[in-house]
């Protein structure tokens, strides 16, 4: 993405940056069998369990820059950013018994801290190693809480992960949803970001792999047409909402602004009932 788009997106997400005050939110960490110098590598997730969990976990891979830098600081969960609209729809998921975990890149893929990534690009996200790392995190999450069914949701650049993990993890997953998929590479220094998405053919994806996208998404890196063509197994199309921010930012069609409640309800129906909502809209749409 362009630098101005990235900066706007991070400003939009600043409301959920920082440290956790809720006692239920916890950092889940899985040690990995490799190191960077003398530092052991780990992959972490920020787990927010439902008050009355039904055994289903939605693992979220956030959009640009895609590296939330989840860690413990002074014994408290800390992060660079979280996906704003996921935070907005999370109460609906929790009410339905669904727990949520934001997934980070492993620490050897953090790169430089900031608004533009220098690591965790498609060469890692498309690799079997990524699947191996996420599998280790799933195992640790299951030790922390009873999780029977694992679902993935990748948003924007995070959908690169959800695509490849759907292929590599297969039957280990109950389902995957690719939200506002970035299918156009960033270009320039970011040519390695979203360069692999178009390599995946629709027929390669499992039957439980579906798409979620706003029909009028104006972010040039995430065209709706890609989702429409790829979605052999199901497409949930969002209409209406707000587009006052940067087109790739918080208050935009790209982030389902003013449609997060409807998107949350559709996700609950899909995860708990297996029902795909073809058109997600608000009153008056």
Task: Give the ranges of each region predicted by the language model.
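The feature captures the conserved acid-bearing segment of alpha/beta-hydrolase catalytic domains
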Residues: 175-240
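N-terminal cap/lid segment of alpha/beta-hydrolase-fold proteins
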Residues: 22-53
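Alpha/beta-hydrolase active-site loop
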Residues: 85, 113-144
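Structural cue for short, hydrophobic secondary-structure segments
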Residues: 60-63, 102, 153
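Short, surface-exposed "cap/lid" segments of acyl-processing enzymes
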Residues: 51-92
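Primarily recognizes the serine-hydrolase "nucleophile elbow" in alpha/beta-hydrolase
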Residues: 139-204
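C-terminal catalytic histidine-bearing segment of alpha/beta-hydrolase fold enzymes
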Residues: 233-285
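Conserved alpha/beta-hydrolase
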Residues: 85, 90-111
């Amino acid at each position: 993405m362009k630098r101005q788009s990235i900066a706007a997106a991070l400003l939009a997400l600043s409301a959920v940056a920082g440290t956790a005050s809720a006692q239920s939110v916890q950092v889940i960490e899985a040690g990995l069998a490799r190191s960077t110098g003398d530092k052991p590598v780990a992959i972490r997730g920020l787990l927010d369990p439902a008050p009355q969990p039904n055994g289903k976990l939605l693992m979220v891979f956030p959009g640009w820059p895609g590296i939330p830098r989840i860690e413990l600081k002074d014994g408290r969960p800390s992060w660079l950013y979280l996906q704003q609209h996921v935070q907005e729809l999370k109460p609906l998921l929790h009410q339905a018994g669904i727990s949520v975990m934001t997934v980070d890149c492993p620490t050897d893929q953090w790169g430089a801290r900031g608004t533009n990534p220098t690591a965790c690009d498609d060469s890692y996200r498309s690799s079997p190693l990524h699947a191996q790392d996420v599998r280790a995190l799933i195992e640790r999450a299951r030790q922390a809480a009873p999780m029977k069914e694992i679902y993935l949701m990748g948003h924007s650049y995070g959908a690169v992960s959800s695509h490849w993990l759907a292929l590599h993890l297969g039957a280990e997953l109950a389902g995957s949803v690719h939200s506002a998929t970035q299918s156009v590479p960033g270009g320039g220094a970011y040519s390695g970001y979203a360069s692999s998405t178009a390599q995946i053919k629709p027929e390669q994806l499992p039957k439980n792999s579906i798409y979620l996208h706003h029909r009028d998404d104006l972010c040039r890196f995430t065209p709706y047409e890609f989702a429409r063509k790829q979605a052999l197994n199901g497409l949930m199309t969002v209409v209406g909402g707000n587009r006052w921010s940067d087109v790739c930012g918080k208050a935009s069609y790209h982030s389902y602004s003013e449609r997060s409640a409807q998107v949350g309800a559709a996700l609950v129906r899909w995860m708990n009932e297996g029902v795909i909502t073809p058109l997600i809209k608000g009153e008056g749409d």
